[in-house]
Amino acid sequence: MKAESADGHIGWGEIWCNFPSCGAEHRAQLLNTVIAPLLLNKDFSHPSSAFEEASTKTHVLALQSGELGPMAQVIAGVDIALWDLCARRAKLPLYQLLGGSNARIGVYASGINPDASLQTVQKKYQEGFRAFKLKIGFDTELDIANVRSVREWLDPALELMADVNQAWDLATALDNIPKLESYGLSWLEEPLRCDSEMRQWQEL
């Protein structure tokens, strides 16, 4: 999304949505019909003021409509755009406007799907990545084979992670996690559904 100030500066933000793709259209509608009318043609001294305005005035609506997540994602996209706008106006990188350091930040290659996992890791390694996160949670034998092949190819000092994308139930997680222990994963992401009962997380 694009934000523009009265003095002609612009900023860009991203409103994130996972599947289905029509969810992005829904968030665009929330932006245009709910959030934008709250903020357009108003004077905000700071991005946080606009964030507070949008969050406060839509909270009850989000509760009543069951839209807490989508509404928060739209407001976050607006917040990003306004911070970007302020940085461009100040002619500063955003990290400097926020007072941050210019120290190097480690990154990892993500979104490595189960088909051709090793080849994707090898390609990303050539591009300069030194940490990798595989998608698993499709088929246990395939998952283990992919993790094993990548781990065997990688230098043991390099990081390898896996993301289940909430595909397992508790029994499956308890069965599969021991099978992954020997591969030195730095972390295992979303092994259960995010709304799983606390007792399941505690047992895991």
Language-model segments: what does each one mean?
Residues M1, G8, I35, V78, ...:
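Conserved, mostly hydrophobic/aromatic
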Residues E4-R89:
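Metal- or metallocofactor-binding catalytic centers and their adjacent structured scaffolds
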Residues D79-P114:
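Glycine-rich, aromatic-flanked loop segments that form ligand/cofactor-binding clefts
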Residues S101-V107, G128-R130, D155-L158, G184-S186:
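Short, well-ordered coil/turn segments that N-cap beta-strands
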Residues A103-A116, K135-G137, D163-L170:
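Active-site mouth loops of central-metabolism enzymes
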Residues I112-K124, L170-I177:
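Short, acidic/polar
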Residues K123-G137:
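Catalytic domains of carbohydrate-active enzymes, especially glycoside hydrolases
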Residues L134, T140-L204:
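Catalytic core of soluble alpha/beta enzymes
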